[in-house]
């Protein structure tokens, strides 16, 4: 009790008052500790009043003793409660101090581990060797060495889903050599070949620089004029049919958006 904060700290006044009250209640009242004064008896005085006064005096002695015992028990319980609260507070402060000491030691070890060695190459001016250790030390101090919080801090972020690649657009070869080029390159859209073949067979002299529109899908019979002989139409259809089945060695490239 000599080094107890209850006697030295801000609670010293309350504990001192409780101790004084306890000592005051344990001390007997002066009416009970004083000796009764014997009164001179006369021969004519009867002894009956002595018997009557002896009973209230005995009751007066029993009542203060019971009240003092109850007050002493209450004070003892209050003092035990204060001592238990002081013990819990001291244990909590010691545990907090131990955690802080462990966090400081771990931060120093991480800082020493992250410091550059003599065998390491020189760092750039923008590199900070103390940054990883400082960040991890701050995370440990915030988590208070909690394994769950530390695991949540160290779990890597999930990788982002791969973005789809945009479709490849190619104008393809133009001019009178489209048929020969189509036989050698199987990665050509059949719809575009059908459109270009129809334009060539009709003898149109318009420039073919721009690709065919997406929604312009006409059959070969509509593009062909009435002056084209039937055998040429049959040959064109057979060539388009052969182009629609490319070889499986090279994957077909998409020229138009789906």
Curated annotation (Swiss-Prot):
Major localisation: secreted
Keywords: Cleavage on pair of basic residues, Golgi apparatus, Neuropeptide, Secreted, Signal
Compositional bias ranges of the Acidic residues kind: 177-188
UniProt-annotated stretches for the region C-terminal inhibitory domain: 219-258
Pfam family, one: ProSAAS
Region forming the signal peptide: 1-33
Segments carrying motif Sufficient for inhibition of PCSK1: 237-242
Protein localization: Secreted; Golgi apparatus, trans-Golgi network
Comp. bias regions, Low complexity: 204-213
Subunit structure: Interacts via the C-terminal inhibitory domain with PCSK1 66 kDa form.
Name listed for the protein in its UniProt record: ProSAAS
